[in-house]
């Protein structure tokens, strides 16, 4: 079981890395051992949401500089796992948006730790419906992309009947894919976690969760409350150093 200590001016955070996400685990450990994160900042902090770090450009960055675009020169394939939740204290990989990153590949170095909030059963029920609709739309859009040439040809031929039939076919395939993959479904355990501990359930299946805080969750709580500028960068630099926990 791999653990890493993150030292900050507000205290230490110990994170445990999941074996269920081996690519993210091994990459994070490699960077820690290389000292990649030492001297970098928690450069993006949003109260009741999360704290983000890992941008190499944040080392010795002048006050007020906008951060968040630095990277390690590579990305990682997503390692989604329905049992690994965006609960409070979850360690997750940051990434670029779906528009430029439809495969939802992770940043090679930037990460965030979830804070979030607790949800009522009614809120979770409503959120589950929204997540399912998002999942359906995502699957449908992917199928449309695969049939783009066919669709363009039908449009050129003004084949309205064919287009309507194809739309119905793709909608059925999207529903089947969502059901098969279990997308947009919130388990009883997830509902319990988000109602009791809290987190950011709307990010499940969107970003890779690859670890969790084992010690120092109170430190995460302190960091998410600090004052920030218009770019969500803390007004006082929060430098980190990371070491392996034996």
Q: Residues of each region from the PLM?
A:
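Cyclophilin-like peptidyl-prolyl cis-trans isomerases
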Residues: 1-246
């Amino acid at each position: 079981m791999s653990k890493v200590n993150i030292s900050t001016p507000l205290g230490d955070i110990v994170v445990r890395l999941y074996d269920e996400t081996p690519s993210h685990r091994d990459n994070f450990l490699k960077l820690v051992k290389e000292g990649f994160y030492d001297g970098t900042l928690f450069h993006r902090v949003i109260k009741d949401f999360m704290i983000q770090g890992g941008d190499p450009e944040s080392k010795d960055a002048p006050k007020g500089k906008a951060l968040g675009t630095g990277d390690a020169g590579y990305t990682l394939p997503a390692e989604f796992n329905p049992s690994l939740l965006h609960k409070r204290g979850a360690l997750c990989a940051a990434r670029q948006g779906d528009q430029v990153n439809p495969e939802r590949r992770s940043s090679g170095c930037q990460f965030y730790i979830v804070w979030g909030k607790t949800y009522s059963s009614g809120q979770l029920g409503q959120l589950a419906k929204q997540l399912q609709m998002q999942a359906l739309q995502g699957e449908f859009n992917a199928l449309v992309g695969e049939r783009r040439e066919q669709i363009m040809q039908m449009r050129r031929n003004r084949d309205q009947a064919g287009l309507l039939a194809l739309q119905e076919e793709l909608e059925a395939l999207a529903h089947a894919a969502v059901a098969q993959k279990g997308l947009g479904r919130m388990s009883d355990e997830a509902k319990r976690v988000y109602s009791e501990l809290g987190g950011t359930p709307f990010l499940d299946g969107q970003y890779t969760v690859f670890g969790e805080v084992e010690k120092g969750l109170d430190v995460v709580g302190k960091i998410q409350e600090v004052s920030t500028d218009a770019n969500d960068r803390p007004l006082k630099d929060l430098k980190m150093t990371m070491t392996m926990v034996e």
